[in-house]
Amino acid sequence: MSADDQKRISGEAAAELVENGMVVGLGTGSTAAWFVKALAARGLKDIRGVPTSDATAALARELGIPLAALDDVKTVDLTVDGADEIGPGLSLIKGGGAALLREKLVWEASTRCVVIADAAKRVPALGKFPLPIEVVRFGHVHTGYRLADIAAEFDLPPPRLRTAERGMVVTDGGNLIYDMASGKIEDPTALAAALKSVTGVVDHGLFLDLADEALVGTDEGVVRLQP
């Protein structure tokens, strides 16, 4: 089974968790897109989707899913989103799609969070996938210097500003992304705290103690994982 098929079946399994009347957080990325498509196909009544990016909002509108802003709901019943890595205890690296801030805001407003992924996303330790760090544009070079100091404290390479063909990658919120490649993050909790202490850092892609369940697509079907 291809990785894309594994993503599809995990998204379809997650769509079965949604019930009529729910407020649903809609994740961002290729795996989350499969969930959004499967959710639309179910034709549930009175659901509202809270998108985590402009791209997800556009897809949901195209498929006819009613949307709500996060500020217009008191609680999100269920959020389904992908991940770049799934480590021990359902610790996650997210943000490869440059939507980590809005994703984390929706996750933290949710009663239940389910991560979906293909089998390759499961890892024994976080860090092979570059850790995204969202920073404000003003003074970002100096913020990068401070991030490099933190990286050195954790025996990690210095982060690099994420760029694309047209220049710097800019998030939906107008911020920039630095990626901290490592190979292995020995202490994700300590690193998360250190990154958040830097003025200019909006947030980072370490999602710790947030996922309630993972649905991982494999060649044998969907595997359910608990923290």
UniProtKB/Swiss-Prot annotation:
It holds the Pfam family Rib_5-P_isom_A. Substrate binds at T28, G29, S30, T31, D81, G82, A83, D84, K94, G95, G96, G97, K121. One of its GO terms (biological process) is pentose-phosphate shunt, non-oxidative branch. The keyword Isomerase applies. InterPro entries: NagB/RpiA_transferase-like, Ribose5P_isomerase_typA_subgr, Ribose5P_isomerase_type_A. It catalyses: aldehydo-D-ribose 5-phosphate = D-ribulose 5-phosphate. Homodimer. This is Ribose-5-phosphate isomerase A. It comes from Caulobacter vibrioides (strain NA1000 / CB15N) (Caulobacter crescentus). The lineage of its organism: Bacteria, Pseudomonadati, Pseudomonadota, Alphaproteobacteria, Caulobacterales. The gene is rpiA.
